[in-house]
């Protein structure tokens, strides 16, 4: 156990909620950090607030970073179509938001250093890094090197460390751990479509629903699931 502080990037989804809960389980005082970046699925921000309250986080902050200003992703540009045919492992999907995680992690590290936090907790996992370049282990290792070189705390040898506890986990493993930890999964939000009810057909809904079915909880699946 530890009395140290951790900053958890909290999207409002299942993965980040589970990572934050694992940080709490490890004894960290957790501060949640969410981002309004112009995403079409802004409902996830409401979910992040609900999860922060459910987990009794020490603090929760939402930062405005308008990445929709220049688009480049189906998550920030409504002219682009969301993928619904299954996750592509050979190409980077159009749900990739240019530079998003680089921006988020940089801001998270700024808050971590300002607050003297020991960890920056990320919910990236094996499903993410199969498609997204900024969720892969080599990216996280490189960013850690950058953080150690670019911050006063890092240069002094006590800078915050990136912690991605789910990085090797499947979505089913994450769902099972979330259930074990008592996370209110029904309050999390994964759907990319931007409505008030999960669509059940976007890739994010599909992956989540498959994991929940495998974990034995069909009652938590999207209402719109085919």
UniProtKB/Swiss-Prot annotation:
Catalytic reaction(s) noted: 7-carboxy-7-deazaguanine + NH4(+) + ATP = 7-cyano-7-deazaguanine + ADP + phosphate + H2O + H(+)
InterPro entries xrefs: QueC, Rossmann-like_a/b/a_fold
GO molecular function, one term: ATP binding
Chain sites annotated for binding ATP: 10-20
Cofactor: record remark: Binds 1 zinc ion per subunit.
EC number of this enzyme: 6.3.4.20
Binding-site residues, Zn(2+): 191, 199, 202, 205
Pfam families assigned: QueC
Keyword Translocase set for record: no
Family (UniProt): Belongs to the QueC family.
Function text: Catalyzes the ATP-dependent conversion of 7-carboxy-7-deazaguanine (CDG) to 7-cyano-7-deazaguanine (preQ(0)).
PANTHER family linked: 7-CYANO-7-DEAZAGUANINE SYNTHASE
Protein name in the entry: 7-cyano-7-deazaguanine synthase
Organism: Synechococcus sp. (strain CC9311)
Gene: queC
């Amino acid at each position: 156990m530890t009395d140290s502080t951790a900053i958890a990037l909290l999207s409002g989804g299942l993965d980040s909620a589970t990572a934050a809960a694992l940080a709490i389980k490890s004894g960290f005082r957790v501060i949640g950090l969410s981002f309004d970046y112009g995403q079409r699925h802004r409902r996830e921000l409401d979910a992040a607030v609900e999860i922060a309250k459910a987990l009794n986080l020490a603090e929760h902050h939402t930062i405005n970073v308008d990445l929709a200003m220049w688009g480049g992703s189906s998550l920030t540009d409504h002219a682009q179509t969301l993928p619904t045919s299954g996750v592509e492992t050979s190409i980077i999907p159009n749900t990739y938001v240019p530079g998003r995680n680089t921006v988020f992690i940089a801001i998270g590290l700024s808050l971590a250093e300002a607050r003297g936090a020991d960890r920056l907790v990320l919910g990236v996992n094996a499903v993410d890094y199969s498609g997204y370049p900024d969720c892969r282990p080599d990216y996280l290792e490189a960013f850690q090197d950058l953080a150690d070189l670019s911050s006063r705390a890092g240069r002094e040898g006590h800078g915050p460390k990136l912690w991605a506890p789910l990085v090797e986990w499947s979505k089913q493993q994450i769902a099972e751990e979330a259930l074990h930890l008592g996370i209110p999964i029904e309050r999390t939000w994964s759907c990319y479509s931007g409505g008030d009810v999960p669509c059940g057909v976007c890739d994010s809904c599909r992956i989540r629903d498959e994991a929940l079915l495998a974990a034995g909880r069909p009652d938590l699946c999207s209402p719109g699931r085919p």
